[in-house]
C-alpha cells in the first residue's frame, strides 16, 4: 500500500503516444518534485480516500485485463485501470474512457467515449468484457447460452421496457446476467 497525491493521472489524454488508462504518477506530498510512475501492471487498485458528494465512499480503480480480440488472437487482453461502477453477488461492472475517431462530414475528429464492461465473478482470469463483447463467442465457452440469452434480452414487450431502463441504468448488464444464471439453474 502506497499513500500519496496523484500528480498525473491515467485517464485517457489527447496524446496519441500515451496508453489510455495505463500509467500514473504519485507524489508523497503535494509539493513533491519527484513523483513515482506506476503502471497497471504494477498495481492492484487505486482508492481515493477523499470523498466527494457524487461518490461518498470514494472511488476505486482496479487494474484488470480487458478483453480486446484481434485477428491473430480472439482471447487477447490488455491490462488497464478501470473504475468500479457497481458490484452484485455474481458480477461487477466497470467503466473507463477511450479516444475514438468519428467522421463528421469530411472531417475525422477524436472523441472521448465512456466504455462499460462486466467481470464475471466465476471467471478465473478476472477478465473485464466490454458490454458489446458479451453477446459474442468470447464468453460462450465459460457461459454456454449467454450469447443467445443476451441477444434475446431486448426482444419482445419486456425487451422494450428493458431497453428503456438500460438507457437510464448503465449497470443493466448485472440484471441480465442474474436472469441468465436463474434460467440456467432452472434447466
Q: What is each stretch, according to the model?
A:
Residues 1-2, 187:
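Sec-dependent signal peptide cleavage junction
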Residues 2-157:
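Aromatic-patch recognition
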Residues 153-187:
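C-terminal partner/receptor-binding element of secreted or periplasmic proteins
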Amino acid at each position: 500500500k502506497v499513500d500519496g497525491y496523484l500528480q498525473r493521472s491515467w485517464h485517457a489524454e489527447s496524446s496519441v503516444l500515451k496508453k489510455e488508462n495505463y500509467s500514473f504518477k504519485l507524489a508523497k506530498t503535494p509539493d513533491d518534485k519527484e513523483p513515482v510512475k506506476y503502471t497497471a501492471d504494477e498495481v492492484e487498485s487505486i482508492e481515493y480516500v477523499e470523498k466527494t458528494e457524487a461518490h461518498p465512499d470514494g472511488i476505486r480503480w482496479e487494474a484488470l485485463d480487458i478483453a480486446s480480440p484481434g485477428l491473430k488472437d480472439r482471447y487477447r487482453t490488455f491490462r488497464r485501470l478501470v473504475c468500479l461502477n457497481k458490484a452484485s453477488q455474481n458480477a461487477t461492472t466497470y467503466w473507463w474512457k477511450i479516444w475514438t475517431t468519428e467522421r463528421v462530414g469530411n472531417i475525422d475528429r477524436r472523441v472521448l467515449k465512456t466504455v462499460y464492461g462486466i467481470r464475471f465473478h466465476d471467471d478465473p482470469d478476472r477478465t473485464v468484457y466490454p458490454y458489446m463483447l458479451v453477446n459474442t463467442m468470447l464468453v460462450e465457452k465459460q457461459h454456454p447460452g449467454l450469447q443467445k440469452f443476451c441477444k434475446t434480452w431486448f426482444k419482445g414487450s419486456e425487451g422494450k421496457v428493458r431497453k428503456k431502463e438500460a438507457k437510464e441504468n448503465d449497470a443493466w448488464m448485472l440484471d441480465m446476467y442474474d436472469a441468465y444464471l436463474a434460467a440456467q439453474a432452472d434447466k
